[in-house]
Amino acid sequence: MSTKYVEVGELKEGSYVVIDGEPCRVVEIEKSKTGKHGSAKARVVAVGVFDGAKRTLSLPVDAQIEVPIIEKFTAQVLSISGDVIQLMDMRDYKTIEVPMKYVEEEAKGRLAPGAEVEVWQILDRFKIVRVK
């Protein structure tokens, strides 16, 4: 599991965070100062990368939050059997199996054996983002 920690105040829309052990993309961040002596708070709304669930988090701006390190690489489709796609990593030629539910909708129609795809590895899980 490759992650790092950053302050909540450094997050921007479009960045990625880990909420409840699930990697999420930040879709909205709202910062507000609570009062004269209170510290600023941030309300983060994020959508799960793998499950699409909306998650909300409210933390102080100076709190540390876990951010996943996303590794992007190219792979070649070896076979498509039912709901599992078998890929070959073009860096070290290892075989990877990715469930069909972890494929972006716009990439599903263009998947075929021999096609090269861009794969994201987030927290030891794989997602096919696009067909090259």
Swiss-Prot record:
Cite the entry's keywords alphabetically.
Answer: Cytoplasm, Hypusine, Initiation factor, Protein biosynthesis
What is a single Pfam family found in this protein's UniProt entry? eIF-5a
Residues found modified as Hypusine: 36
Disulfide bonds, paired cysteine numbers: none
Localisation per UniProt entry? Cytoplasm
Which coarse location class applies to the principal site listed for this UniProt protein? cytoplasm
HAMAP family per record: eIF_5A (MF_00085)
Q: Note the NCBIfam families from the entry.
A: eIF_5A, PRK03999.1
Indicate what this protein is called per its UniProt record: Translation initiation factor 5A
Q: Which gene encodes it?
A: eIF5A
